[in-house]
């Protein structure tokens, strides 16, 4: 179970996407089916922590290590969620979060966060974020401002969106608790329907 943005991020850069079926109990990637989908062209595994429910990351990381693959966690819906005490998005090589208006924490529209858990990706991510220029070298006086070294775009959040997001991050526990209370209200109200087999 996923959303098109996850696949698009790779397909738009020429990657061939191979989907792996889900576990019906979590709606997340079925870790027992990953190995069968790996080919000699596979570069990465992209677990999607749907609705903040963690994928089976121990198994996924073992498979990635065995086949020398990268793991990019789609934690778009998993801010403040964890797996065995580790925050989601911090386990794989990279972790991606979304602040789209439909998420628990929003920047009043679009926006996101990339966690870089592997130093090999830090410089490339910075260059991509800065329209393909190496700003850290520019600020050290080593290159001019308009020396393009790679492809990129302007992935910098505007000040108003950043301020809006910051205000929510300061109250993230309260926001998450309110949402959990709403979830519990629905769960308690609907569980009798499950008991009487009106829903599964």
Question: Language-model segments: what does each one mean?
Answer:
Residues 1, 15, 22, 76-77, ...:
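Histidine-centered beta-alpha loop that forms part of the nucleotide-sugar donor binding/catalytic region
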Residues 8-11, 66, 97, 114, ...:
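Charged/polar positions on well-ordered alpha helices
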Residues 21, 32, 36, 44-48, ...:
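PLP-dependent aminotransferase class I/II
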């Amino acid at each position: 179970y996923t959303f098109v943005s996850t696949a698009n991020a790779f397909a738009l850069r020429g990657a061939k996407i191979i989907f792996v079926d889900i576990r019906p109990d979590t709606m997340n990637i079925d870790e027992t089916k990953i190995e069968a989908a790996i080919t000699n062209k596979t570069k990465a595994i992209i677990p999607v922590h749907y609705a903040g429910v963690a994928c089976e990351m121990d198994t996924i990381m073992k498979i990635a290590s065995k086949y020398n693959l990268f793991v990019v966690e789609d934690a778009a819906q998993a801010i403040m969620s964890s797996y065995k005490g580790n925050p989601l998005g911090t386990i794989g090589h990279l972790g991606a979060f979304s602040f789209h208006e439909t998420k628990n924490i929003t920047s009043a529209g679009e926006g996101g966060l990339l966690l870089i858990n592997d130093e090999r990706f830090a410089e490339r991510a910075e260059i991509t974020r800065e329209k393909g220029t190496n700003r850290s070298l520019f600020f050290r006086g080593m290159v001019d401002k308009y020396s393009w070294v790679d492809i990129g775009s302007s992935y910098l959040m505007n000040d108003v969106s950043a301020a809006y997001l910051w205000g929510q991050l300061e109250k993230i526990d309260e926001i998450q608790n309110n949402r959990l209370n709403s979830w519990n209200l629905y769960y308690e109200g609907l569980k009798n329907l499950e008991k009487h087999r009106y829903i599964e």
